[in-house]
Amino acid sequence: MLRITENELSADLFYELYISVGWEPPLKEQIAVALNNTIAAFTVYDDNNNPVAMARLIGDGGMSYYIKDFAVIPTEQKKGIGTMLMKHIENYIIKNLKPNWAVSLELISSKGKEPFYEKMGFEARPCEWDGAGMFKMVRYTN
């Protein structure tokens, strides 16, 4: 049976899961800082206690949450793990909301993965209310 843990994701495990999906990883020191400043980090383990997915939830805790580093290892994709993890994240947010609160939940999809997120209720940008999402990497220079 799959199991999800909260806030037990180490920098080393993050690194392993990150590269498993073909992403160029940040430095482990940078990962550790990011994890330390994350609202919640989620790790999914399979029946054999092998890590198969992760995600981080960042944001202000009041009006806006952002899903970052949502990754399911390629051999375990299309098995419902991502759906289970996304539902877990949404339930985590809901149980931490105050009465009458509504918050935005945002993310940037990997190319080609948009249908998964749309199935989970996310709306692509631009749309009727919003323009295109924007992205910029800022790098250290001396």
What are these regions (language model features)?
Residues 1-29:
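Short amphipathic alpha-helix that is part of the acyltransferase structural core
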Residues 32-35, 39-55:
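Conserved beta-hairpin
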Residues 93-100:
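Alpha-helix termini
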Residues 6-7, 100-142:
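C-terminal "cap" of GNAT-fold acetyltransferases
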Residues 76, 80-88:
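Conserved acetyl-CoA pyrophosphate-binding loop and the N-cap/start of the following alpha-helix
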Residues 63-74, 78, 132:
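Conserved acetyl-CoA binding element of GNAT-fold acetyltransferases
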